Amino acid sequence: KTESIDVMDALGSNVRVDTKGREVMRFLPRNHDGVNEEWLADKSRFVWDGLRRQRLDRPYIRENGKLRPASWPEALAKTAAAMKGKQVAGLVGDLAPTEAAFALKQLIEGQGGVVECRTDGAKLPSDNRSAYVGTATIEDIDDAKYALLIGTNPRNEAPVLNARLRKAWLKGCEVAMVGQAVDLTFDYTHMGTGRDALAKLQGHSFGAIKDVPSVVIVGQSALTGEDGAAVLAAAMDITEKTNGKLLILHSAAGRVGAMDAGATNPDAMNAVQSAEVIYNLGADEVEIADGPFVIYQGSHGDRGAHRADIILPGAAYTEEQGLFVNTEGRPQLALRAGFAPGEAKENWAILRALSAELGATFPYDSLAQLRQVLVAEVPHLAQIDEVPENAWVPVQAGKLVSGDFGQAVTDYYLSNPIARASTLMAELSANAKARSETLIAAE
């Protein structure tokens, strides 16, 4: 029995991991009033079979179009040879712990390259924590009298947060939505589906709302368009006008931690297009074009591994200690419940070994030493289980274009490599699809 953190969404629900031998047998919720109370989303509870299937358990090297097993020394030597003197870019995936994102940033920037964790193109300013995390805590929802949702479907993006919103609604909270009309299990006022409704709302006077607690929740689908920065600026403007608090609802468990660690670059996604070598740390949702040499480090044989020229097998979230910062900016520790299969290693350790192979050895030999270096750069990460107060810095950005907001999570049950490896999640996804098609046919 190991106390840990769930990574299926960015809420950071506290869980207990029960293992038998090497295998995870079940996940149970742990009580944390500030995050998930005593609840856990069904997906988080039943995704354990995905940790057993399609695992990467040894390094692979692609030769003549086919992947062949390799030893660690050979794989690391090949990786270092491929990276030396080349234009390198790094991608940080959604499930990467903060330490691994920080180590990758040091490795790639040491080779003159750039690193990016905002792989979905979200226009989140990396130097403004009040804009990429917000100022609200999850507990603030409990006391809110008004809640505005912008471009988000919390039922898919963070089901336990949605349950908390429902609890507030039952106590009299009025909820309004700008975005696609979805079933949230409670009533809300639908203001419109896109930017026009947001612009109209921005011009509102908000009389009585100013005197009572309110919260504005912004989803990732609102921030991934070309005008994502303008949408964020509008949301912050509405938050100011209502004397409310802002919560950026992330859909990736590792995103806030990676941004805190500095794994961003304003020109990174353009650099990825022109890079000769791409180091992919579990970013399976990114389509990488033919051309660049791809090194994939991750736990599952998912999309990223299929495109890779070298595969370095890493541990999953239950198989290594890791720091995850949740959507409200709360650093939490995920503890190791079991060991990675076969020859798979901890993610930070792979990057440390590769740094030595490249002749630019990191100044740490253990996870504890890495954390000391990380905390020296980002002091608030030492405050485990505390939500730092972020200084409010409004974003000044361009004009809103016209158009509707989309969905950040299109298939709830298959949103990451672990879920896609799960037979149960595949079955649930198929059932959900059949249900939605039946509803459309009935209409």
Short names for language-model regions:
Residues 34, 43, 67, 319, ...:
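Alpha-helical structural elements
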Residues 371-443:
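Long, low-complexity segments enriched in small/aliphatic residues
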Residues 1-205, 221, 354, 411-443:
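N-terminal export/assembly segments and adjacent metallocofactor-ligating motifs
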Residues 119-386, 438-443:
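Non-catalytic alpha/beta scaffold blocks inside enzyme catalytic domains
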Residues 44, 58, 277, 362, ...:
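Intrinsically disordered, low-complexity segments enriched in small/polar residues
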